[in-house]
Curated annotation (Swiss-Prot):
Enzyme class: lyase
Name under which the protein is recorded: S-adenosylmethionine decarboxylase proenzyme
PTM section of the record: Is synthesized initially as an inactive proenzyme. Formation of the active enzyme involves a self-maturation process in which the active site pyruvoyl group is generated from an internal serine residue via an autocatalytic post-translational modification. Two non-identical subunits are generated from the proenzyme in this reaction, and the pyruvate is formed at the N-terminus of the alpha chain, which is derived from the carboxyl end of the proenzyme.
Gene Ontology molecular-function annotations: adenosylmethionine decarboxylase activity
Gene name of the record: speH
The record's free-text note on cofactor binding: Binds 1 pyruvoyl group covalently per subunit.
Pathway(s) where this gene product acts: Amine and polyamine biosynthesis; S-adenosylmethioninamine biosynthesis; S-adenosylmethioninamine from S-adenosyl-L-methionine: step 1/1
Organism of derivation: Oceanobacillus iheyensis (strain DSM 14371 / CIP 107618 / JCM 11309 / KCTC 3954 / HTE831)
Length: 126
């Protein structure tokens, strides 16, 4: 069955604590991951929290990559969602997990848009 998108949710544990709290490293890693996966980067926004932790998003033409890091737990919550078949989200997730030096990871891929994609809209989209 065809899907409109692929959404990978990654739970990364036992990550490098310093890297989880380094906004420049996280930002660069996520942009690299998007490019390596074949995506076109549109916007990049990352925000540090006090006393530690980072949340951020890389908006790609094909959807997005996000992170919420919890250095105090050695944990990062990662989402990589891609539309179409040009981008491989698994490449992005692997790059991120390797860069963060995660020794324990759980990954789940969710096919998106498998529902009634041929349904008629209730309203016309302008």
């Amino acid at each position: 069955m065809d899907v409109l998108g692929r959404h990978i949710i990654a739970e990364l544990w036992e990550c490098n604590l310093e890297k989880l709290n380094n906004i420049d490293f996280i930002r660069d890693t996520f942009v690299e991951a998007a490019v390596l996966a074949g995506a076109e980067v549109r916007e990049v926004v990352f925000h540090p929290f006090a006393p530690y932790g980072i949340s951020g998003v890389v908006i790609i033409s094909e959807s997005h990559l996000t992170i919420h890091s919890f250095p105090e737990h050695g944990y990062a919550s990662i989402d990589v969602y891609t539309c179409g078949d040009k981008v491989d989200p698994n490449i992005a997730v692997k790059h991120i997990a390797d860069a963060l030096e995660s020794s324990v990871g759980q990954f789940r891929e969710i096919p998106r848009g498998m529902g009634p994609v041929n349904a008629k809209p209730i309203q016309k989209i302008k």
